[in-house]
Amino acid sequence: MMKYLAIALMFLLAPVIVADAQESQQNYEIMKLIRQEKFDLILPGALRDNNVDMWIHVVESGRMDPLALDLGGWTEYRAWEPVCYYIFTDRGGDRIERIILGGEDLDGFYDIEGSSHDLLQIVEERNPDVIAVNMSESLGIANGLSHTSYLRLAKALGTRFTERLVSAENVITDFRVRRVQREVAAFAHILEIQRQVMEAALKRIEPGVSAPEDIGWWAADQLLAQGIGPSYQAASLFLPYMPFSYMPVESADGVFQRGAFIMWDMGVGHLNLGTDIKRYAYVLKENETKIPAGLQRAWDNGQKAREVLKNTIKVGRTAGETHDAILAAMESAGYVSTPSDDRTSQYRDLMKELGDSDKFGFSVDMHTTGNTSVGDAATGPQMAPWRSDRAHLVIQPMHIFAFEFEFNAWIPEWNKRVSINFEDNAIVTHNGVEYLSPINEDIIVVR
């Protein structure tokens, strides 16, 4: 399977010259193909594996639903239809029946198109035992059903069918995390563009001249030229694009100074996909010809730890089981667990306890990515001590995630213990963990 993916990526990443090529049309056709493949290949298992007969996804007119690009159709600004029902029913066979009520099927994906007032008739004719709807206590993208829409739904269905309602969070989770080949190829393509832009941007730093925003805006322009924007939904779209002096020198007068260790955490969004990676650079001091020995030692051992982690993550385990296996493997290799169960000061406190010893501490945050950058918003298993609500989820084949871990070490030249947060994006297959783009193997040196 991965052999064919590799071949697809070769063609995808190679320069292609097409007369009068239209990028907008290309993006539309890619999204359409992914949606079709997900409906045909992923949706049946997402319902059947969770013992769901019917999935009703409720969308209010004028509100952007988290699954809008996954499901397609037109639901916005339809004053005559204040609510839209996407209805997916398992009626046997090799496909799931697809119905849209109160919206418009623009691409021919749905078998039946009608009014939202037809809901009860549709449900009665199919008489499902279990009806999953988009309400959830813990998963934001599966909780788009507002209170008023729930009341409207319950009134339309009546007590008989309302009593059969369950959360669709498991259906939505499986529908999202089970990937089709074109989805993975698109993600890898976007990720590689981002990686090249970030690394090129860091190499442009002029000590004492370049400010973080100079580098950030340049990178933003390069990405936007290819139609790629940020995936973090921040108040300022500029926020994800700014690198900063991580250690030990602050940016005097707002520019990068010599001796600065720079960290850059960025996520980009495109084609209903979101990335999340980090890159590091070091600005040599006037009398330096290479990275300080203490920092290089920490980095090299972090790369060794990466291999231990990479060999521990397998398909078929739950996130919780995987986290336990990671702790055992890392501690067996001589690393000290310095976790944070509450995402506050616990990690820093444990790190300080190691002081100036030669020991290396670590904590992991192997969170899902793929459709969004941040694990808190993404579906799927999360391997992190503070993400226990996702610990029961099983790592499935083609699981895309942020290969992220914090690694701390004493740096003699700086007289302090420093934490380095490694992060690249990867996929788990039956072969193990595979990176979707070249990793941050070396610190970028700025002279």
Identify the role of each PLM range.
Residues 20-447:
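Active-site neighborhoods and metal-handling regions in enzymes and metal-associated proteins
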Residues 6-15:
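Bacterial N-terminal signal peptides
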Residues 1-5:
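Positively charged n-region of N-terminal signal peptides that target proteins for export
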